[in-house]
């Protein structure tokens, strides 16, 4: 069952919580393959560190891969689809990336961070969480909680 509520709270939008499988069974254990796509190295690193800390606190040990360009990200996604992805690109580039990711990986869990309010597009694309930049650590962590729902 999908809960398709749109709730605004400062720069935070809860879009969709789905029960789609967001893990892959490898060798008898669950593996999260999480892709982080962002233009700025500091931003990619910050999201990757927050994801790793959050998952480790839950007893999960994800494979987090960072990408700085969409072409490499989508080539990798076609070969080995991520279970989860964070898209943090500015403007229409973020919208295009979110649309392309959804077409390639229909069940991939997605957190989308943008400087423009694409919350309705994020809802249409079944993003789990949409955040307007600047994104606080607390707001991002709430997005990560939706991945465990």
PLM region spans:
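Non-catalytic signal-transmission and effector/linker regions of two-component phosphorelay proteins
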Residues: 1-35, 45-48
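Conserved acidic carboxylate
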Residues: 38
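Acidic, metal-coordinating helix/loop segments flanking the phosphotransfer/catalytic sites
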Residues: 67-84
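CheY-like receiver
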Residues: 83-148
């Amino acid at each position: 069952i999908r809960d398709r509520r749109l709730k605004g709270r400062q720069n935070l939008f809860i879009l969709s919580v789905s029960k789609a499988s967001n893990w892959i069974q490898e060798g008898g254990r669950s593996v999260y393959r999480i892709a982080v796509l962002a233009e700025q190295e500091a931003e990619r690193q910050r999201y990757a560190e927050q994801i790793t800390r959050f998952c480790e606190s839950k007893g999960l040990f994800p494979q987090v891969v960072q990408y700085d360009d969409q072409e490499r990200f989508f080539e990798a996604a076609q070969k080995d689809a991520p279970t989860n992805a964070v898209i943090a690109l500015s403007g229409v580039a973020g919208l295009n990336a979110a649309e392309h990711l959804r077409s390639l990986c229909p069940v991939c869990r997605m957190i989308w961070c943008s400087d423009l309010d694409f919350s309705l597009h994020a809802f249409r694309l079944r993003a789990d969480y949409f955040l307007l930049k600047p994104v606080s650590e607390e707001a991002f962590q709430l997005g990560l909680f939706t991945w465990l729902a």
